[in-house]
């Protein structure tokens, strides 16, 4: 079984997501399995060059994971025609400039979300990439989580009947950084550095809602900075200027009428649910609750008939009336799964719909969420133009 390699300039792999999910659990894992399986039976082997500012960290990562190349010179790395793909997991504030440079060098581009700090800039990047004839994609990992894939299977099968509502609960307690180390970087809590839970999570909720239930057509949001002061990585106290919790309501254009979705996102909540993310869907024929990996259902024929009576002990075990959705297959790491899709897209032109225009939709919803919070009102979510956009291969 033959194969060939494909070079990837990986910028930002010393950060939490860039390292754990993109380098270790995606690219290193793909290399360990012998490359990406192609339709003709060959294998496509990624050959990364690690790029960043910290020479010591880059060298250590390269040695640890058996990677031959690393550099602190992004321009030099982009100038190498042997590496046709550029990947960006740097800070949101600098991503657009990096992506523009990669486009100028003719690179195909895959990057973390959010694509940029505002919708106009995100659309501009999409148009520039199309004009340059390069392929482009944005990470939309939650679509490929086992729990969400099971939920999509239920939607496609018609299990729910007419979908009425979607309820999402996401978050966990992120320690302040004093008596226990924070699980997230300090820039997440500084709006001037691109932080904030709306900017982070509304990008996720946009693609999950759009691709699973229906296009988002309106948004209402209220947010808060519940923890006003935190401690950074160097032990210094700082003022949190970004929102750490957001409570959003969305109207979706479902196939059989509007669907109401509510998502609570918080880094200041203690978990009392099976997983860090829980999504409940209620329909006329049945309901489901999905997490990161699991999914449970309750059909109308299995729905109990409770009545309100606070004067007696609850006679129902409501959790017992739900059934697990079987795997019916194997689920790989969500980031790795999408990486393999994008690599095939670049190599042989297989379809890939999660492009910069899809990424711009996430930025748009985050912007409108922030505006809704500031103006304390509902806002329509208009369709974004795909001016000059190429059709998916």
Annotate the PLM regions.
Residues 201, 206-302, 336-352, 367-369, ...:
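Contiguous beta-strand/loop segments that form the cofactor/metal-binding neighborhood of enzyme cores
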Residues 1-65:
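N-terminal Rossmann-like dinucleotide-binding module
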Residues 142-240, 376:
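Predominantly a Rossmann-like dinucleotide-binding segment in NAD(P)-dependent oxidoreductases
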Residues 41, 46, 345-362:
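Glycine- and charged-residue-rich phosphate/anionic-cofactor binding loop of Rossmann-like
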Residues 53, 328-339:
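Active-site loop of classical SDR/Rossmann-like NAD(P)-dependent oxidoreductases
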Residues 84-85, 91, 96-143, 158:
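Beta-strand-loop-alpha-helix segment that lines the small-molecule cofactor/substrate pocket
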Residues 3, 134, 161-165, 371-393:
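C-terminal capping/lid region of NAD(P)-dependent oxidoreductase domains
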Residues 69-81:
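Short acidic low-complexity segments
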